[in-house]
């Protein structure tokens, strides 16, 4: 109820800096608009206002600039990616039926102040939404400031301000006059900080009161001198800090009742920005793309392409399976399901993996198309392939009944089939993704046996070691504290032990991994803290985390996700098998608790340097190809090339550095990241990269050509036709462009490697099924596959794995696989 006034610039800025960069396919940034709209919808729901307005600053100088030339002089200009979103934001707000208030010569704060004062005069409740504490001075019995915070907004009333600061809202002006405000370049009294300013105002009520009592014994000599020297600055700062309550704007509050929403304009704007989730939230459908655009051509092609061949639409709903002709699917009983799954009927699924999970079937014969997987291939940047999301994205009515939804899915299939056929990725769907779903579901059902007692005992050891280290940390600190608290840890490191630090921020000192790494040789407490963190993470994330997901059968059944990554790699959850730590000896111990059941062994097959072999193949670099063809260690060869040493002179340290350079090139990291990885200066890391690219000229040429082609086409592809669009290449922001170039370089390599792993999984699964061997594929972790096999056939399975994986695809260099057998995952390494 009441009036909601939003500080437009403040909320938009918070969204821009608080949300990772999002762009549409034309490179227009959308993160600020996305964040603002989410905030707006939340505010409308929470506050339910009768009247609403959004206040914005204008570029023109205000009366404060005329009063003080230095006002906000330290502010940098608005970032280009934010500036390009501002016009969109204002148009969207207007289309929402909300009034925007701007006034030349006045700031948004003054507009907010004037509106809130008008509300208070009329005894109408007013909520001010802002990320700026300057508005605290406006708070009274009718005006509440809702301060935007990451972990939940905070409501400031007179009582809350008194409790937090010990002063009244109006006295916040006096406090700011004394302490100044570095963000607005308000000088205040030099040398007076917030703590002193608050104590002075608590005692003397105002700036006038402070100067009237300048000789008081309650004011120390040092503070008195600062006050005397800074009196003129203090009074000027007070004028700058006080929000105007009489800005020349319309204060007839009834004029701010929201107008009817312009859904057509709103849909047009959000469609142009490709904000499909927001369209869905607002229950709007995308509009047609602008004539002549890439999107319009695709839409035109979609309309001309004939519908897909007749077949059954297969849907799941509330644990039931429905199948049948478009518009007429029927519910299948358990008995009917089994027969139907093995039938020759042409089937079109919506989320084949979910369908197999619900049905309990091992596979779905003659499944020709899957809507979810096709949508993933068409738009791998999305993180939502639900039916409602796809309907919003492609402008298809969703329907309510299962019969209507089958019509919806058929329409989506026609659109998506057109898209992936045009892009050449249809074969990725039919030959890789759909067959892979069968493999993933089988792996999830099988699970992997876990030694729960062993994990518990290991966890106890980890806790004991962490406890021992914590005692050593307390000895160095001189007292006990919460090591897990960045605030308390910062106090110990930078105040008690006086270690060098970056400047203290409002939230305290930074104690992140980079900071600790820079302090590693400054005090013996630092390596102990790093080790303590590693141990507590191991305990909390992996030991406790694994025990939580062990099923009644003594096995964990991880969920393998097929549509999560942009490169095509498989990810997993509950638990995330891909993240089981392997870099430290203690972390590697975790593998001991992944074990084969009684009478069985684990057979582990791991591709050797698959991404570098893919790089050699697609770049055609002769030196790298020769190394793989000759069976020479590629990292030793790279060390020889980069560091100009004969092969026999390459030391383990040089090989280690060369390995980091090799994989740094694959993952597209720059000199800064490489320097941190191998412990050298940034210039030295740059030198290594230049040397690498000069020696491996084929790779350098490939990188240049790939980036140039990606800039021209807007996308890159894997060897098999999986496409990834790189919107960042069209961005105006240089950092975004650089990121886009790195993605262009590494996606074809990583994506091709991911496709090869998937092809290998399908081949291994099918071969095991055909062989009759008592063995099941149970895990995929990065570049390795793990099979649980009966002891008497483990060696046969090892040969089968090696044969299928090494021959999954043909490259110009050999793919080699290391195969090991053991009772536990640890034993296979």
Show which residues each predicted segment covers:
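C-terminal polymerase-core module
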Residues: 467-471, 475-527, 694-742, 746-748, ...
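Active-site-proximal helix-loop-helix substrate-binding element of RNase H-like nuclease domains
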Residues: 99, 152-176, 183, 319-440, ...
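Active-site palm subdomain of RNA-directed nucleic acid polymerases
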Residues: 420-432, 436, 756, 760-781, ...
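Function-dense linear segments that define catalytic or interfacial modules
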Residues: 372-399, 403, 408, 562-647
């Amino acid at each position: 109820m009441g009036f909601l006034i939003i500080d437009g610039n403040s909320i938009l800025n918070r969204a821009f800096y608080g949300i990772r960069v999002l762009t549409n396919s034309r490179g227009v940034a959308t993160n600020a608009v996305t964040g603002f709209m989410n905030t707006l919808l939340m505010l409308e729901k929470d506050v339910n206002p009768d009247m609403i307005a959004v206040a914005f600053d204008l570029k023109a100088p205000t009366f404060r600039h005329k009063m003080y030339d230095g006002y906000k002089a330290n502010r940098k200009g608005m970032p280009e990616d934010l500036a390009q979103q501002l016009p969109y934001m204002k148009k969207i707000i207007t289309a929402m039926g909300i009034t925007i208030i701007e006034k030349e010569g006045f700031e948004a704060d003054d507009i907010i102040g004037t509106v809130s004062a008008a509300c208070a005069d009329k005894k109408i409740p007013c909520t001010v939404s802002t990320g700026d504490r300057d508005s605290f001075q406006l708070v009274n019995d009718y005006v509440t400031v809702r301060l935007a915070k990451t972990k939940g907004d905070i409501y400031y009333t007179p009582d809350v301000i008194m409790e937090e600061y010990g002063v009244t809202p109006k006295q916040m002006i006096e406090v700011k006059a004394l302490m100044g405000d570095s963000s607005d370049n308000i000088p205040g009294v030099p040398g007076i900080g917030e703590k002193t300013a608050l104590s002075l105002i608590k005692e003397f009520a105002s700036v006038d009161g402070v100067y009237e009592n300048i000789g008081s014994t309650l004011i120390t000599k040092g503070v008195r001198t600062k006050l005397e020297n800074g009196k003129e600055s203090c009074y000027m700062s007070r004028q700058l800090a006080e929000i105007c309550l009489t800005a020349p704007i319309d204060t007839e509050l009834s004029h701010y009742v929201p107008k009817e929403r312009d859904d057509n304009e709103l849909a047009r704007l959000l469609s142009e920005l490709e904000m499909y989730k927001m369209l869905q939230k607002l229950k709007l459908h995308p509009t047609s793309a602008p004539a002549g655009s890439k999107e319009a051509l695709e839409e035109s092609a979609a309309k001309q392409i004939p519908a897909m061949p007749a077949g059954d639409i297969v849907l799941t709903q509330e644990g039931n399976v429905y199948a049948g002709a478009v518009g007429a699917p029927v519910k299948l009983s358990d008995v009917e399901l089994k027969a139907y799954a093995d039938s020759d009927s042409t089937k079109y699924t919506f989320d084949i993996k979910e369908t197999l999970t619900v049905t309990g079937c091992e596979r779905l014969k003659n499944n020709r198309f899957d809507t979810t997987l096709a949508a993933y291939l068409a738009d791998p940047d999305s993180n939502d392939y639900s039916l409602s999301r796809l309907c919003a994205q492609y402008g298809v009515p969703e329907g309510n009944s299962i019969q209507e939804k089958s019509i919806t899915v058929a329409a989506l299939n026609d659109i998506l089939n057109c898209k992936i056929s045009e892009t050449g990725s249809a074969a990725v769907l039919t030959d890789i993704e759909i067959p892979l779903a069968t493999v993933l579901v089988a792996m999830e059902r099988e699970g992997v046996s876990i030694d729960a007692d062993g994990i518990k005992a290991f966890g106890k050891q980890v806790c004991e070691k962490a406890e021992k280290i914590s005692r050593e940390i307390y000895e160095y600190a001189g007292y006990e504290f919460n090591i897990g608290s960045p605030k308390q840890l910062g106090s110990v490191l930078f105040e008690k032990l006086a270690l060098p630090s970056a400047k203290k921020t409002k939230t305290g000192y930074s104690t992140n991994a980079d900071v600790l790494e820079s302090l590693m040789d400054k005090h013996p407490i630092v390596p102990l803290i790093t080790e303590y963190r590693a141990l507590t993470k191991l305990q909390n994330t992996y030991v406790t985390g694994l025990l939580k997901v062990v099923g009644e059968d003594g096995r964990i059944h991880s969920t393998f996700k097929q549509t999560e990554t942009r490169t095509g790699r498989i990810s997993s959850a509950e638990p995330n098998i891909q993240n089981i730590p392997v870099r430290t000896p203690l972390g590697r111990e975790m593998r001991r608790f992944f074990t084969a059941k009684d009478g069985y062994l684990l057979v582990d097959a791991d591709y050797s340097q698959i991404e570098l072999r893919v790089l050699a193949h697609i770049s055609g670099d002769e030196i790298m190809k020769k190394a793989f063809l000759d069976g020479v260690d590629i990292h030793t060869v790279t060390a020889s090339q980069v560091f100009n040493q004969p092969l026999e002179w390459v030391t383990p340290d040089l090989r280690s550095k060369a390995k980091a350079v090799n994989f740094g090139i694959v993952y597209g990291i720059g000199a800064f990241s490489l320097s941190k990885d191998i412990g050298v200066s940034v210039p030295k890391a740059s030198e290594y990269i230049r040397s690498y690219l000069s020696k491996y000229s084929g790779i350098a040429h490939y990188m240049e050509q790939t980036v140039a082609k990606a800039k021209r086409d807007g996308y890159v592809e894997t060897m098999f036709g999986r496409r990834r669009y790189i919107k960042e290449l069209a961005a105006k922001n240089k950092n975004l462009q650089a990121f886009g170039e790195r993605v262009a370089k590494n996606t074809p390599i990583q994506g091709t490697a991911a496709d090869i792993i998937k092809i290998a999984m399908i081949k291994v699964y099918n071969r095991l099924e055909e062989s009759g061997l008592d063995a099941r594929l149970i895990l995929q972790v990065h570049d390795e596959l793990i099979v649980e096999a009966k002891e008497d056939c483990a060696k046969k399975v090892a040969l089968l794995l090696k044969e299928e994986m090494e021959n999954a695809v043909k490259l110009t260099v050999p793919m080699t696989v290391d195969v090991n057998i053991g009772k536990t995952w640890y034993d296979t390494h």
